[in-house]
Each structure stands twice: as C-alpha cells, then as structure tokens.
Amino acid sequence: MSRIGKRPIPLPKNVTLTLDGQQVTVKGPKGQLSRVFPPEVNVVQEGEAIVVKRRDDSRPAKERHGLCRTLLANMVEGVSQGFTKKLEIQGVGYRAQLQGKTLVLSMGYSHPVEIVPPEGITLEIEDNQGKKVQQGTIVLVSGIDKELVGNTSARIRAVRPPEPYKGKGIRYMGEFVRRKVGKTGKK
C-alpha cells in the first residue's frame, strides 16, 4: 500500500467535495477546481476527511494511488488557501512591469518580453520592502491551481534563467545558483 496514498486528506469546514463518478469537484472560498481521476482509484468522503482507495493491487493502480491522493490534497489546499510563488529578478537594468494583466519583462534583449497569464492566475510586482508596485524586481505568481502556478512561474523564469558567472537572470525566491569562476580566475 502506498504510504502517501493511504493517508486521509482533512477537509476544512469551508470546503465542499462533489463526487460524480470519476469526476471530483472541490469548492472553497478561493474558487472551484475539478479533475477526472483514473478508473484505478476511488475517491470516498468519510466524515470530515477524504480517502483515496485503489480498486485492486494491479501495477497501474499502485502507481497512481499516491499521485491521485496528492493531486486531491493540492486541490483542497488550493481552494482554501491558494498557492503563491515568488520570482526574483537580478541584474543591472532588469525589471518587470505590469500593464493591465500582462507582465512586461525588460531583460536585456532588444525587445521587451510580454507574458499573458492564463485564466485563474494573478501576477503582482513587489519592491524590496514588500509593497505592491507597478514596476520592480520581485514577481508574485498566485492562483488556486498548483500546477498552473508552477507552469506560469517556469515560463517567466525561462525568459532569462540565472547564469552561473554573474548570477544575473530570473530565479525563484531562495533558489541557490551555483557560481562558476570565469576564465581569468583559472590561470
């Protein structure tokens, strides 16, 4: 039995779960998420908890058991609290700017890079003191779908990933970038 899969998911008071065959819908104060789970697993509500059970001990069922439990736990956490990722921009002249909902990045290219967030994702810019501003070096990506927040953050980071010599680029807040010594340092 999967160690992760057999743990029950606590259901907060302000979150409701709707089961329709393999379709699971979770509603909460932040919004609503829905997902179709594979036929190898069953989602059951037992009182104030959700339990993911597998139908049999086949290999595909064992493989998906823990995954489905984690996906469902992320859905519950997303509609109740939401997810946020912080990205930090480092480099002289590198900055982010919000124009409506579109994020415009000035990253040293000959043109500004525009990123339009998908539905359900909000982008904000902070300064170093944590105040919301229109132009700055810290980008907040937030939403209720953990996968969408992560993918949007990765798309923003991919515009200019941190380089190992000077550390310039876009990195996740707290990400460690291994530095290298340049050619002059080897001799």
From Swiss-Prot:
GO terms for cellular component: cytosolic large ribosomal subunit. One of its GO terms (biological process) is cytoplasmic translation. SUPFAM superfamilies: Ribosomal protein L6 (SSF56053). Keywords: Ribonucleoprotein, Ribosomal protein, RNA-binding, rRNA-binding. Pfam families: Ribosomal_L6. InterPro entries: Ribosomal_uL6-like, Ribosomal_uL6-like_a/b-dom_sf, Ribosomal_uL6_a/b-dom, Ribosomal_uL6_bac-type, Ribosomal_uL6_CS. Transmembrane segments: none annotated. GO terms for molecular function: rRNA binding; structural constituent of ribosome. Belongs to the universal ribosomal protein uL6 family. This protein binds to the 23S rRNA, and is important in its secondary structure. It is located near the subunit interface in the base of the L7/L12 stalk, and near the tRNA binding site of the peptidyltransferase center. Part of the 50S ribosomal subunit. This is Large ribosomal subunit protein uL6. It comes from Thermosynechococcus vestitus (strain NIES-2133 / IAM M-273 / BP-1).
